[in-house]
């Protein structure tokens, strides 16, 4: 027998000893263990219940209320879309506030920003637009582009051009990127950075040559080239 091996009765004694120690440990700490396990279960059930009975109904209610505000927005009634028509038909401001954490509230921030921009309230519009958050290639770049518009109106040209270029890069599409690049080019011209403006106009011509912007950007390009001489 190897000196590493135990006689059978010694092995059984060792197992019994471990079992006894385990029983003693549970006797001493069993209450704490049960409480800890129960706490985990309660938290898990609480999260499920919160999602099922609070978050889901909240999101559904927010989405339902968005329809009325969106109808006002589509009709060009910015003030009504923003402020709402009372408790039964709140506007984007109230939806964003009352249903925080839902997709509808997130989108309401974007709508609020657009309405405020149209009203000439650029600082307030900027604040609302910055509260919007999404990771996709259509709405998020469009909001980023409008942030650039707000910054231009506020005279923050350096920040504006960064916002436009970020929007163009995030979208990387014929539908959004060309307009963002042209807006950035216009700002670069205001800043006297004609070389950068020319580079962006050329990008529209070459990379987005099938878009309507590619047909009209020639005028921007000629102007920037003339001013840059």
Feature roles, as predicted:
Residues 1-39:
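N-terminal positive-inside, membrane-proximal cytosolic segments immediately preceding the first
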Residues 78-79, 85, 122, 157, ...:
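TPR-repeat structural position
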């Amino acid at each position: 027998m190897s000196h590493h091996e135990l006689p059978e009765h010694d092995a059984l004694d060792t197992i019994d000893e471990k079992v006894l120690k385990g029983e003693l440990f549970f006797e001493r700490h069993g209450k704490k263990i049960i409480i800890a396990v129960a706490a985990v279960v309660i938290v898990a059930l609480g999260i499920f219940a919160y999602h099922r009975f609070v978050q889901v109904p909240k999101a559904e209610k927010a989405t339902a209320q968005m329809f009325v505000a969106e109808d006002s927005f589509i009709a060009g009634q910015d003030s009504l879309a923003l402020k709402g028509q009372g408790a039964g038909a709140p506007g984007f401001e109230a939806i964003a506030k009352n249903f925080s954490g839902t997709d509808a509230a997130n989108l309401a921030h974007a709508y609020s920003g657009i309405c405020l921009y149209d009203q000439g309230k650029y600082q307030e519009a900027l604040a609302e637009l910055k509260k919007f958050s999404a990771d996709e290639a259509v709405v998020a770049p469009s909001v980023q582009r409008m942030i650039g518009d707000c910054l231009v109106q506020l005279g923050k040209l350096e920040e504006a051009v960064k916002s436009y270029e970020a929007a163009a890069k995030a979208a990387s599409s014929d539908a959004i990127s060309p307009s963002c690049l042209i807006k950035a080019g216009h700002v670069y011209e205001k800043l006297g950075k004609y070389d950068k403006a020319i580079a962006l106009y050329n990008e529209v011509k070459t990379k987005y040559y099938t878009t309507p912007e590619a047909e009209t950007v020639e005028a921007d390009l000629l102007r920037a080239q003339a001013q840059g001489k």
